[in-house]
């Protein structure tokens, strides 16, 4: 049984978001003994219990208040919200933050030998999908009538099997579509993982834990998006060097021993440092340029 004073968080047991969700909690310093054969895993160092379930069960568990938090793809979340609206069921929740993984898109695709010139090319055809509500919402806005073929898996084989004329499915790289003789023609919905909470009263103790967890999650994501930069630069080019590096704060500038014309500069850059930027830094006279990953960060 769950202890009512502990935070309950629903996570995908296996699949696309499972390992990234576990990695996120681990990076936040939460020690959870995760065993895939178990439904519930308990944190050793924080009052947090993880419920390991199917991804399409997570929105309902949060909306119904069975768990306090959930990590789920926005595509699954929105599909369940639309489904519940159609059934006049409880569908409220709060998005605490979007996460930096599970990035994909829900797209329409047709066989490569099919003529497609405009969204109107999809009128009155049969479309296979696992996301009927998202598909209907999108095509209704375009005033496109269609026939839906609901499939819970292997959607990409539907045209070859004669079940549908087109599909609406998740796409990451497009390799699966290509392997099945399909081409992407229209993006329906863009998605990534998000952290959600139930929409209702949460006691003070739980709020404190959730706030602490949120601070850590934001710190982990910020660290992933940032790099620690160290370099030597000419004093007379310092402002030009700084202008190339986008940071939350001004850099630390230190004197170099035995060199009055150059300084050492340290800063956290909030953007990915590309080779082109490094080449521009070098052209300004910067040297000993080091770009280091950041494990944890708190502003």
Curated annotation (Swiss-Prot):
Cofactor: Mg(2+)
GO BP annotations, alphabetical order: L-histidine biosynthetic process
EC number: 2.4.2.17
Regulation: Feedback inhibited by histidine.
PANTHER family: ATP PHOSPHORIBOSYLTRANSFERASE (PTHR21403:SF8), ATP PHOSPHORIBOSYLTRANSFERASE ATP-PRTASE (PTHR21403)
Reaction catalysed by this enzyme: 1-(5-phospho-beta-D-ribosyl)-ATP + diphosphate = 5-phospho-alpha-D-ribose 1-diphosphate + ATP
Regions annotated as coiled coil: none
Organism: Buchnera aphidicola subsp. Diuraphis noxia
Protein name from the UniProt record: ATP phosphoribosyltransferase
GO molecular function: ATP binding; ATP phosphoribosyltransferase activity; magnesium ion binding
Keyword Cytoplasm in annotation: yes
Principal location class: cytoplasm
GO cellular component entries: cytoplasm
Function statement: Catalyzes the condensation of ATP and 5-phosphoribose 1-diphosphate to form N'-(5'-phosphoribosyl)-ATP (PR-ATP). Has a crucial role in the pathway because the rate of histidine biosynthesis seems to be controlled primarily by regulation of HisG enzymatic activity.
Compartment(s) where it occurs, according to its Swiss-Prot or TrEMBL record: Cytoplasm
Keyword terms: Amino-acid biosynthesis, ATP-binding, Cytoplasm, Glycosyltransferase, Histidine biosynthesis, Magnesium, Metal-binding, Nucleotide-binding, Transferase
Subunit structure, interactors included: Equilibrium between an active dimeric form, an inactive hexameric form and higher aggregates. Interconversion between the various forms is largely reversible and is influenced by the natural substrates and inhibitors of the enzyme.
Pathway: Amino-acid biosynthesis; L-histidine biosynthesis; L-histidine from 5-phospho-alpha-D-ribose 1-diphosphate: step 1/9
SUPFAM superfamilies listed in its UniProt record: GlnB-like, Periplasmic binding protein-like II
Enzyme category, top tier: transferase
Gene3D superfamilies the record matches: 3.30.70.120, Periplasmic binding protein-like II
